[in-house]
Amino acid sequence: MRRHRGCINLSIPLGLLAGIGVTSMAMAADAPSVHVYNWYDYIGPNTLHDFQRDSGIQPVYDTFDSAEVLEGKLMTSRSGYDVVVASNFSLPTLIKAGALAPLPRDQLPGWKNLDTGLLAKLANNDPGNQYAVPYLWGTNGIGYNVDKVRAALGDKAPVDSWDLVFNEDNLAKLGQCGVAMLDSPSEMLPVALHYLGLPPNSTDPEDYKKAEALLLKLRPHIAYFNSSKFISDLSNGNICVAVGWSGAMLEAKTNAEQANNGVKIAYSLPKEGAPVWFDTLVLLKDAPNRPQGLAFIDYLLRPEVIAPVSDHLSYPNGNRAATPLVAEATRDNPAVYPSATAMATLYTLEPLPKATERVRTRVWSKVKNGQ
């Protein structure tokens, strides 16, 4: 999971989301339904209401807060869900387990709207794009306090490069104003490997020794590893640099602007390349309401439907036809919609063999403990 989406797991009745009263919900009890499982706070405020209004299908909408919760539910029993929002990183596991149904493109007229370049990247996790529709996506990069980084490194600070955080001289200076990184070996170690010129999805233990050596050298200058605290700390000026998700950095920037506290936050997608992640719409193999599930997926493939979702959440969508409909402030922001040049440098992360996972876990433990 590569987004800050809250920390609770709850079921949201459509009536509460859309302002529909209890009476209308009761009247809809016999209506066809679709059961949807999504990340917490990860849809437009009117999307579900409008879908029910247009289709007559009642969404039953539950949320989760981690990929582990999602995979655990889908891998251990019949979940009862029709459509699930799954990360690209989870797709190989779910496909191998036979949990997903191939998508019949002839029943998804909106498929033609998808960005073929994004589909090509997603195919690294979903070969042939058989199972997953891109919903929203983002990148992992560097969020920074413009003024404090300039004060520490001068006007020529390499804010467009991973040298900002992986060069020891730079990090030693930035450490004085606070540096944070994600507490996520599956996301941080690939970035370190890539910086060293090694495959980000390497299975070679020797490569991880090199990444370990790099991070241990930097460890004294890193304030902490955490996957949520950095958002408020960055927006409040308590730290000056964080490595994390694009949407989280935009959240920090927005929070600082709303607080009018004088903190200027920017997001950089390093020129050497960075991870790109996707959240995708998948249809479960045992979906009890398959036609309604396909109808829900195709609804989200409508440009006029997905564009407001991107505006609301500040994440780009995978729908090329929707781009002109996205608010100018969103679509022209390179932190949200990277340039074609930047897109060419992005890479996806992949699940690794269990033996490599164990190596990675040991390395990360050493790095966090500084030994």
Q: What residue ranges belong to the model's regions?
A:
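A ligand-binding cleft/hinge motif common to bilobed small-molecule-binding domains
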Residues: 90-93, 241-262
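Periplasmic-binding protein-like
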Residues: 208-217, 223, 261-282
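Short beta-strand->loop
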Residues: 101-112, 259-275, 284-287
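Extracytoplasmic ligand-binding site segments that recognize negatively charged/polar headgroups
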Residues: 91-221, 228-235
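Mature extracytoplasmic/periplasmic domains
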Residues: 284-345
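Early extracytoplasmic/lumenal segment of secretory-pathway proteins
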Residues: 28-97
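A bilobed periplasmic-binding-protein/Venus flytrap-type ligand-binding module shared by bacterial periplasmic
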Residues: 143-148, 194-198, 277-289, 308
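Conserved C-terminal helix/tail region of periplasmic/extracytoplasmic solute-binding proteins
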Residues: 232, 340-371
